[in-house]
Amino acid sequence: MKTDLYSSITEKISSDKFSSIFILVDENTDQFCLEIFIKKSGIKLFNKIIIASGEDNKNIDTCVSIWDQLNSYKADRKSLLINLGGGVLTDIGGFAASTYLRGIKFINIPTTLLGMV
């Protein structure tokens, strides 16, 4: 079992040959986590999708917004969605990825304890 998160992500991304990569963040993980994650993971090309933070935003309207943004960026079945955030973000991001075009691959990168369980 690997313990280096960043090398595991880099290995997964390079082995699957994704057509496009999307990173889902909220305003907090956009400000405090995204830059560090990008530098350490070595991801070069990606599209960023931002949603509002908070439990109130775990709803179908947020999911539709994610689907709309994936669609506008021309996401396809070989796209990858990386969910960088806490429990709300990983929940809604996982659901959105699982239901977009009958499911695209996603990786959860939890930033809170709740996001890890």
Feature names for model-found ranges:
Residues 58-117:
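Glycine/threonine-rich beta-strand-loop-alpha-helix active-site module
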Residues 1-80:
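ATP/NTP phosphate-donor binding region
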